């Protein structure tokens, strides 16, 4: 189901709680909401649709991947960039890493480990920041 985008900075600044198998529908809601906002958005965190759970969706270029309880386990090659966010107006400077490795659970609750680089790594880092209440 397509959900409204949350723009409340206080809510977005709160850390998320771990997701459980019972939260699978939230992942589906993220898929629907990202699809509805495709022209202006490449990733989302569950708190952006009003749910403080550790769930994100990242556009990988050819597919959108939902990640439950995602954690960055390694990162390399720091750089400065500017980013926008559907929950905020304008762009802001931030620091990201060119390459990351992330662990997460998929829709089947199978643990995954994936190496990401470039734009996809940047999207993933932005969304994982949302989970800890960090807003660019």
Placement of each model-derived feature along the sequence:
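Positively charged
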Residues: 1-136
């Amino acid at each position: 189901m397509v959900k409204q985008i949350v723009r409340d900075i206080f809510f977005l600044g709160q850390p998320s709680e771990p997701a459980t198998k019972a939260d699978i529908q939230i992942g589906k809601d993220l898929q629907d909401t990202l699809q509805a906002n495709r022209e202006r958005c490449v990733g989302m965190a569950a708190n952006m649709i009003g749910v403080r759970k550790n769930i994100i969706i990242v556009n990988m270029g050819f597919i959108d991947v939902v990640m439950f309880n995602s954690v960055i386990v390694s990162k390399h090659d720091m750089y400065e960039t500017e980013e926008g966010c559907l929950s905020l107006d304008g762009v802001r400077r931030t620091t990201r890493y060119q390459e990351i490795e992330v662990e997460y659970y998929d829709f089947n609750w199978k643990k995954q480990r994936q190496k990401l680089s470039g734009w996809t790594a940047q999207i993933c880092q932005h969304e994982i920041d949302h989970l800890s209440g960090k807003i660019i």
